[in-house]
Amino acid sequence: GAAPGQKKDPVKEFKTLVKALHKAGLELVIELYFDGTQSPSYVVDVLRFWAAEYHVDGIHIVGYAPLETIVKDPYLADLKLWAKNWDEVRLEKGTDRSSRSKEEKKGPGRRLSAYETGFMLDMRSFLKGDEGMLNQVALHVKDNPDTVASINYMANTNGFTLLDMVSYDHKHNEDNGEENHDGTDYNQSWNCGAEGPVRKKKILALRKRQLKNALTMLSVSYT
């Protein structure tokens, strides 16, 4: 934010943030939601704006968007794109790659990624000991599509955090005015023996071990 006494300029602050991240060798992927009522040209214009004006490295597209049109847009050829429904898009050979060479990008150039909850939910089920999950886990670990990469995660911005995952069997959003109706009920979590914050050392140790197991499974999925 702005220093005390200075006028706030969110646009300038965000651009400064992006520059600082890039200077540190980090990339920035923002999340944008479209509800399906926007025209394809409007959606493309929005993505172009963020890429050209703010120099973001990628966009996580949530909701409904014309993915096939977006992929073919030349102004977005170097933008990393994360989305859910790539299986519904006809991808031509090479569309998952950046228009720049490996040397120019200093990386593999892969830019399209599937961002779905399947890995997270199946791995959480396996983590808490649900039966019949071994085959699903093996499929996720071996999964490496030729066209679209897979982004695996054990928690994201929509739902339980990693600590919530080992601390609660059910969501508890009673105090936010939504009467606990907001958020998904399907979190595949396990509280390790007691709901919410505890002081029992055995439960705390088990939760810590489960967190380590979760991060280990995530790491293995990328090897």
What are these regions (language model features)?
Residues 55, 67-223:
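Conserved alpha/beta catalytic core and glycan-binding cleft of carbohydrate-active enzymes
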Residues 38-52, 209-216:
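Short, acidic/polar
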Residues 1-41, 56-92:
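Acidic/aromatic-lined carbohydrate-recognition and catalytic surfaces
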